[in-house]
């Protein structure tokens, strides 16, 4: 019974543990085992690993060996593939996979066989990242099955294009192992061609061909079924079946045509201007068209950019010009908008199409300067029929598919708010051409109608009743009612379809000035309140017009709402404008000469000449569209006239656009004799040759009518070019008779431009621009129909129609670009940032790079300042940016301190030459915003670079949203605080911004609403500042990939697995303890019988089969009586039972375990 005693004396806690462990679910046991296996495996896979090739001809070939746990071993070749070879070649820096021999060509390896059934995708960074059976596991491989590879670093490989007429087109041939071979055309596409053209430095791929288009080759066929993504550095880096593996013959040899080897050109035909018309492409010596299938604004933008025209505004599907003929070279063109040439966009193969010439594509290119959008016939600029003028062609918009989204875009573009409705039937019929504009749709959030996609200009008809008409929310049609003379009366404004009056407290002198101008009533004379012109009826508009006075229409003025019911018709406002709106010349031989007559108070009368001078006459001639004043003859030359002689005296300066703009006095003027009436002779339609009044070689040209005040020559002979970015390019302007004016582009050509460039000392003309290429001018259009022979020394020595004689508008202002015109830019294909990139200068009509020899920080500062970027920058190393290759213009630029522009810095002579990217200058200018005098780079006083100097920001309205924009712009973390009152000291210089009101999501501070630049009443004691979170990004250096893995990841994995296993064992321990506690509670709450049963079962569970056999074989049935209570102490230690209970348990046990 000693064995039984051992059972009774055993700690029942360990018995609990064994019982619960045995009763664990299969899932729990599986998890424990898997984690244990992972723990063991990770200790193996996490060690450092290395890769090498052994016994090969060179470092890029041989038997594959892997080092694991400091022991080198081989790889079995079961399932060995080219994908695995590619991974190994890339890993070892031999990127070109040649072949995957089934067994090593060299002698067999020795030691462990570490890997078997290796399965790679080809893009893994290391061989052990591929799937395999497990370290050291293999299918009874021997070292006769050791895997090997043959790679190459590409140095012994060559490629060429043959039979194409040049080195950039032809049949593809590759030299491998000393033999030239071809490429099969199976699955060959534009991606393959792109790799080849880039590899051969032949530009971009234009086309590819198969079926031995360039003749059949000879020798091996090296590649078949290539798979390229288009960005590989060499063709042999694309996926392939292996060198020399194919199922082709030379009838399937592939070829390519690259851009540098193609005879490619693009032109526009049959357009209104040189930048509009049908598109035609020259390919392989023949011109053909482009089908309009899928043609949209992205395609048009690429075409316009390629042609050197402004941004594409219209993408014409069917043009007004005649149909093309010949080839249709391209179809289904699909551009993203950034491609440098139309043939670099996706398209069908050259010559493959499903079109006819009724579907020829075209474009109209424009930067918007020659486009005009307006609403006509609706009573104000914000309502009416939609009219579009594109490059002198006037058209209407067809309302097929026209809705509120399209109308919203028009209203927004015109500054007229949002669309109220899209039809207003009482508009007057404004005549337009039969040219119609069609839009497929707008999404409603475009900034202009030109931004809507899929324009179609012309080619289709639209009925007159289909013309698009809209009314915008800012539509306010003004009128003057109840006045006793023209241009006076009660102010009434029409909103929508309703007329209403304005309260006299809501209409300022500035608003009245705008009203008079819009009604063509000259200037405001007075504002009269208190219903001076009678009380109106109906609506009184509860809004205040907040005009500045320079607006052309009342609808352009901001409006502030006013509470309803605070005004009555007894306070209707009235306005009196200048009365001198009707004026004429009478008794002259032409409409542009004669006696001056005004209509005042409904009656015509002559004007007294007591204060009439040439400046007044200039304004009158311009108002009558008669050019400029040539003379102001006296002595009633054109008759005395009948009726009233008005004694009003005009005080014009000569620069006004309208006689009503000139100050007028009449009070106290003396009576005027009938022979003292004002007269004028305007230049009108007279044709003459004009010269400088100050020229010593040419005296003033005598007029045909010798009057004492005649002017027939330019007063000072001044000439300038405006808005061109330099003194040698821009809009041509001439100073004549006290005002600057422009030249019309009719007949404007290089001969005229040559004279301008020579006169200004700007070399020769390289471009004579028209259509207000440099923006619309103001003032007179002095000259038209210029006919220079190119030898004149002054532009006004050329023949023309004469001063002011023209039929033009400022949309036709002429301009020039001279050879000495220079411009500057930083450009980068990878970024649109204008303040970083390759330094380029424009000279003699072309862009070129700048060499970095002698380039200094001082020179970089000059460049950055000239570009308005910052006051300094840094020189970057040669960029990998794939910027277009262009020649170098200049080198050795050495700027001393002081120059404002790069043009003032000495350098080597201009010399156009080819240069390598390493010789070019790459610059990054500093940020236009900075923080000063703070403890870190992300806190301090806010300063902005603008207008060539650093300045501060006033703290009026400055808050955390403004600070957030600054922090984001500087690359710092979120804003912590927005400081006021010069927290980081007072700055110097201008205070550039005030009343900044950011939302917090703007990309830069100058995108936030604020007062105009430099308009501030603040002092530097109000300088704004910020405190941003200071983000310090520390880059962890990466270990070079040489076949060795990092130990760090292995340690981490082992640690995690250990923690998981520990957690599982702790959970089992607490589970056991908790169950024992429940059992104690159960025993104490039950009766004695239950206690006896539980104890019996617990004892029984601790006895194995041998114990039971021993007890059953006992011959002395009374041995059990020898057990004493003392021998059961170990039981009572775990179950609190009495002595009687112990005896009962013993007796019960004897009865159950044998018939003693």
From Swiss-Prot:
Ranges spanned by the short sequence motif Internalization signal, renumbered to the chain: 1096-1099
Disulfide topology: 76-141, 89-151, 120-130, 184-248, 197-258, 228-238, 291-355, 304-365, 335-345, 398-462, 411-472, 442-452, 503-567, 516-577, 547-557, 608-672, 621-682, 652-662, 744-808, 757-818, 788-798, 864-925, 895-905, 954-1018, 967-1028, 998-1008
Keyword Membrane tagged: yes
Cytoplasmic topological intervals: 1072-1156
Tissue: Expressed in monocytes and mature macrophages such as Kupffer cells in the liver, red pulp macrophages in the spleen, cortical macrophages in the thymus, resident bone marrow macrophages and meningeal macrophages of the central nervous system. Expressed also in blood. Isoform 1 is the lowest abundant in the blood. Isoform 2 is the lowest abundant in the liver and the spleen. Isoform 3 is the predominant isoform detected in the blood.
Site label Cleavage, positions: 269-270, 281-282, 333-334, 360-361
GO molecular function list: scaffold protein binding; scavenger receptor activity
Function, as annotated: Acute phase-regulated receptor involved in clearance and endocytosis of hemoglobin/haptoglobin complexes by macrophages and may thereby protect tissues from free hemoglobin-mediated oxidative damage. May play a role in the uptake and recycling of iron, via endocytosis of hemoglobin/haptoglobin and subsequent breakdown of heme. Binds hemoglobin/haptoglobin complexes in a calcium-dependent and pH-dependent manner. Exhibits a higher affinity for complexes of hemoglobin and multimeric haptoglobin of HP*1F phenotype than for complexes of hemoglobin and dimeric haptoglobin of HP*1S phenotype. After shedding, the soluble form (sCD163) may play an anti-inflammatory role, and may be a valuable diagnostic parameter for monitoring macrophage activation in inflammatory conditions.
Miscellaneous comment as given in the Swiss-Prot or TrEMBL entry: Intravenous lipopolysaccharide (LPS) produces a rapid rise of sCD163 in plasma of patient as it induces metalloproteinase-mediated shedding from monocytes surface. Long-term LPS infusion finally increases expression of the membrane-bound form on circulating monocytes.
Protein name per the record: Scavenger receptor cysteine-rich type 1 protein M130
Gene: CD163
